[in-house]
């Protein structure tokens, strides 16, 4: 977490000692500022097309509730995604009798990501109502071809739902380019915010939908505190209807706003370039040692997986990492590497040294 973000959080906690500075307008200025920064980050048409959602599972529950699908239809998802982007569809398939097509990665090394993308496109048919995937896979950084998925979805009348948690903030994303129907993102990852915070985009498909939660702030005219007991049937226009209760959260919301503002200032394209320039020489060294890494066209620069050659042992390489204070994530048989602006060449040198020791063992 950025120091400036932490400072805002600490200050907000102490502000609770004297809440007199909070005016009725503060509830809505807070949320508008956050939505505005997120809309800028993903190129959304307006802040009102975005909603503050505390988690991916919360946002996807809203998507699931409003998906127009039933028995005889199907949904297509990539396999081994983060659980939130499976459980929502697994539950919905059982509830409504919708077929859930889970597309696994092929058991191959060369061309694995390209073939996986092809398999996803092949799984989409005229009964498909939704495709749900990430921009990059959370375990190994496999990049999914969102433009091709959107094109195929248009051909069959399906919607596209993107979990952007592992990419938004570090990998450029454009609503106008990819035309997703929904984009959900947790704030604690590449947007560098606190836990229990996040923002989502809901497109035209969802603009007249029904949210999973009925709170006072997602109702029409909730800005008028004097008339809150004049209960409203109508929701706020746009995507704000899907916002979580207490979205004005005077601690988490300003923290995430500041974090995304900083990411916007840096620019995801610059972060991606920095990560590419930082890692490229060391990726070449790792490949020479037999480590398997996806081709550049089909992986993120900010997140990618390393798969060990047969003569290296996962438990032993983890020991090498521990000795060198290298912090990575093990996801199945993939070692997930996720650099950012705070990483230096010396970090990558220590990483490669761990593999060199194993290669000579």
Regions inferred by a protein language model and the residue ranges of each:
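Pyridoxal 5′-phosphate
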Residues: 1-361
